[in-house]
Amino acid sequence: VGYHAAKFLEEEDGARIIGIIERDGAILSESGLRVEEVFQYKKEHGKVEGFPESTFFKEGAKILEHPCDILIPAAMEGVVTHENAPRLQCKVIAEAANGPVTYEADQILNEMGILIIPDAYLNAGGVTVSYFEWLKNLSHVRFGRMDRRFAEAQNERVIELIESALGKTLDIQAKEKLLEGPNELNLVRSGLEDTMRQSYNEVKQQEHENEKITDRRTAAYAL
């Protein structure tokens, strides 16, 4: 979970990953770690210690307290406790594991103004995609099979109109991207993003409209 979260945040969203915790310890680099390079290094050496241009910490949990924007505990439960919670310097905690923040730590972090994206919401992505897979199995037709060529033909007509209006031909690479119809992966990602966005908005709305609810975790449970 942690690998894929870091990989997509870096490669698709331009995030700078400064710290990674593994079983043998943790590595830190303020200039940023290339997630795939770290993954391949660990695969080859069996550890992250010694990864180039990084600082290694034998006690990996110590870097939980390092300043960052988003902290993603993604492996074990109970890693953020009442003991280390007061020392955390992040703005957001995204719970990608089950129960990584204890009850006492949760209270402390809320008082500190640190936003917690709860596991009950954040871990729903896998279940959502499993639901999509179930729908696909019921129909025995892969997503995009019925409309991909139609979408490509529509895109081609749009490009022809644009080129006609501009009086010049579009760059071939830009044209290829515009012409490409939706494939199964794109459609699944689109459906997942829509589901997660809508769900998060419902959680926020629940928190804002119910005066008894003061945090996202309680709002998620209330839904």
Model-derived regions, located:
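Glycine-rich phosphate/diphosphate-binding loop of Rossmann-like nucleotide-binding domains
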Residues: 1-65
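Alpha-helix-centered segments that form part of catalytic cores
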Residues: 50-68, 119, 186, 190, ...
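Adenosine-phosphate binding glycine-rich loop
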Residues: 91-222
